[in-house]
Amino acid sequence: MKKKIRVCLFVLVFVGCSHKKKVPDVSQIKVNLQTIRFEKDFFSIDTNNMPSSLQALYTRNKGFSQDFFFNILGIPPFPDSVAHDAKLFFSTYKSIYASSVQPFQNFEPIQEEVEKGLQFVGFYFPKYPLPTKLVTFIGPLNSYAGIITPDNSLAVGLQLYLGKDYKVYQSDEVLNMYPSYVSRRFEPAYIPVNCMKNIVDDLFASNKPSKKSTQLIEQMVDEGKKLYVLYAFLPNTPDSLKTGYTQQQLSNSFAAEKEIWTYFVENDLLYQTDPTIVSPYVNDGPKTTELGEWSPGNIGQFVGWQIVKKWMEKNDKVSLQQLIQTPSKQIFEEARYKPH
């Protein structure tokens, strides 16, 4: 039987503070980012003349059109299939496109935030090929919120950024795909964060150790490493956006940091590999049921982040690339994390 965590509610009003590192000057890092509004081109096509309209669309958007039709819409690469399925998608999603026009009429503030993030990427990873295009699109609701395309563009699916209260997100069909604890993050402010998360995932895929993490503690530190790098790319972005927690959940986690760690230790969870045991602590959810109503889902990310911060304080000459390449088990053992 697991020992329960007990946290007095009055403790949870305190806001934890992370030790802020000095933010480097990245003003000299050159970023050339062009925003391409693919959804405007797509929803301007003449559906009564699909072959020529699609050909014109291909001509204007050579790089992204193929990704959109074949990978995002999942249409077989045959002319008749593309024309038929694209027309069906057009009629099904034109109302969602209409809903996106006003909130994204001026995309410059979002582009500027993405550009700032890319400057930090270029500073910390000078050999990383920075994306030169930011492509917006409207895709299926069960498709991507954002991806890095094969031609190294950042693509953003606006259908998943129309605001947490958008009526379509309240339908039973969409709630089955995206419960409210997920759709509350369907806000435009998450676009720069998710663009940087895609780059973080790309960096980890290229640089992480070959040994797969299986123990809970390794998986938590894996997530903590990603969050630490994300913070480096977005130093001025609100913590709640980067963690995906509500501000109250984040404050609660800092306030109960010692109790959270004690729970994992006393219940012998750190070295567990059984997915049914590990999953509740490293997957998204409205809360971590085992800890209580006050907690966020994916609490393992928070714990791993604190461990990584502790290790980096002891190894302040270590680069972010070296952090990524260092085995998570090694980071845990060397950090000697023990919150007070």
What does each model-identified segment do?
Residues 1-29:
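Bacterial Sec-dependent N-terminal signal peptides
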Residues 18-87:
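N-terminal mature-domain "stem" immediately C-terminal to a signal peptide or N-terminal signal-anchor/transmembrane
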Residues 37, 116, 120, 224, ...:
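Extracytoplasmic/secreted proteins, especially bacterial periplasmic and envelope-associated proteins
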Residues 43, 119-126, 230-238, 265-269, ...:
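Sec-exported extracytoplasmic/periplasmic mature domains
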Residues 83-95, 273-283:
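Short alpha-helical hairpin
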Residues 85-250, 321, 326-328:
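Acidic/His-rich structured neighborhood in mature extracellular/periplasmic domains
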Residues 221-287:
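Acidic/His/Gly-enriched intrinsically disordered linker/tail segments
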Residues 265, 271-340:
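C-terminal soluble interaction/assembly domains
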